[in-house]
Amino acid sequence: HAEEFFIGPMLTLIPPTACLFEICFAKPSFAHVGTGFHEIAARRSDYALAAAAAHIEADDTGAVQDLRLAIGGVSDFPQRLPLDIHIDVSGDKADTDTRLTTAIDAALDSVDFVEDMHATASYRRRVAAELARRAVDDALCEIAQDLP
């Protein structure tokens, strides 16, 4: 679990002389999978000031069965956001967007945003919210294209 793997900013449980060779992911449980990732950095290939990744699984009707959203670059650790929302890929987009924005904003309340010479905490929060919405939207669009 990521919560146990990261022990500090830029630090993991892996000793300095060790090398990570493999990461295993669970096989998706549902027929349709969508992913999205967005980040922002001061320069190309710099560490992210904020990043968001989404992984969504839906059944054959387009009902989302699993939505995972994580953010990074905004606090000491990358973290998964606890989202409490029901989404149907074929549902009303405006309604979905509104409910998603509300759910993401509520989930971000639990994050301790860092402030440093690169960005303020409030900037990181605003950007993380937008990147999270974009990542989820990309994942939903990917699923929508896959549905019959």
Model-based region annotation:
Residues H1-P148:
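C-terminal structural segment of proteins
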